[in-house]
Amino acid sequence: MYAVIATGGKQYKVQEGDAIYVEKIAAEVDSTIELNEVLAVSKEDGLVLGKPVVEGAKVVAKVEAQGKSKKIIVFKYKRKKDYRRKRGHRQAYTKLVIEKIQA
């Protein structure tokens, strides 16, 4: 059984026991959260698609870690004009472990 969920503007195909990295969610480490935006659920009798979400379906996940990804360097440069700009960015993420899919 798998589900397609949407969080942080992205979609993820998940199964029970999967670990996924999503955009930062404001939750404590080792807490349990419910993801209610379930777009599709695969059951024994077939695939159930939501319009736009599946009614009554939710995915329960445990927050395993909060962190930042690798640094991305953005460097702007204009020749002959003595213009240089160097910026760094580290995107915050949340690591989730899928515990249960309820549909």
Curated annotation (Swiss-Prot):
**From the UniProt record, which GO molecular function terms apply?**
rRNA binding; structural constituent of ribosome
User: What is this protein for, i.e. what is its function?
Assistant: This protein binds to 23S rRNA in the presence of protein L20.
Q: What's in the keyword line of the UniProt record?
A: Ribonucleoprotein, Ribosomal protein, RNA-binding, rRNA-binding
- Asked if the Swiss-Prot or TrEMBL record annotates the protein with the keyword RNA-binding, the reply is yes
The name of this protein is Large ribosomal subunit protein bL21
Q: Which chain regions cross the lipid bilayer? A: none
Q: Does the keyword RNA-binding apply?
A: yes
Task: Cite the InterPro entries for this sequence.
Answer: bL21-like, bL21-like_sf, Ribosomal_bL21, Ribosomal_bL21_CS
Entry-linked PANTHER family = 50S RIBOSOMAL PROTEIN L21 (PTHR21349), LARGE RIBOSOMAL SUBUNIT PROTEIN BL21M (PTHR21349:SF0)
The species this protein was found in:
Clostridium acetobutylicum (strain ATCC 824 / DSM 792 / JCM 1419 / IAM 19013 / LMG 5710 / NBRC 13948 / NRRL B-527 / VKM B-1787 / 2291 / W)
Q: Which family does it belong to?
A: Belongs to the bacterial ribosomal protein bL21 family.
Quick one: a GO biological-process term for this protein? translation
Spell out the GO cellular component terms annotated for this protein, sorted alphabetically and separated by semicolons.
cytoplasm; ribonucleoprotein complex; ribosome
Q: How does it assemble?
A: Part of the 50S ribosomal subunit. Contacts protein L20.
